[in-house]
Amino acid sequence: AASLQPPFFDMTADDAVNYGGIGAVIGHEIGHGFDDQGSTYDGHGALRDWWSADDRAAFEERTKALISQYDALVPRQLQPDGPHVNGALTIGENIGDLGGLSIAYRALQISYQDAGGAPEPVDGLSWQQRFFLSYAAIWREKVRDEACRTQLATDPHSPTQFRCNQIVRNVDAFYDAFDVTPDDALWLDPSQRVSIW
């Protein structure tokens, strides 16, 4: 019930805001069924390798790229010499975040198609922009340096700044929504963007 309130969900907000919030969280949980651990269980919950060898190899290749991205990240308040994110430790949650955002975005697109079209901008913001701004809002936090160091050493979740910014850097729709260019700090070359699913 705690998640069914702002910034995750707001009954007075439009669909783009709610899909970017609670939709991404629900998608994240669905994504765990197909992450590094969930993918080893079949539809009945039995531990079984049910993927083809080609599927597993493609998954491993993509996850290696995502691990490398996260291994390079140092939280803003600990820069320049602070500890890095452990991409291998956080990979399951990073896959969940990336998959969750992608699932929510696609679900919103389908919802608008079924409704006969996308809504007009609100306060000058397109539905795409409102979706991504809502996603960013769910990850806002202030954290003390020592708590950040502890999280980096023990928590399978990446620091929230990367649960937002590093994820959207891998989503093409984000670039389109905000006209992100190579001159912008969040730019990631298309050849380096990771899409697991």
How should these model regions be labeled?
Residues 1-23, 33-197:
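Zinc-dependent metallohydrolase catalytic domains
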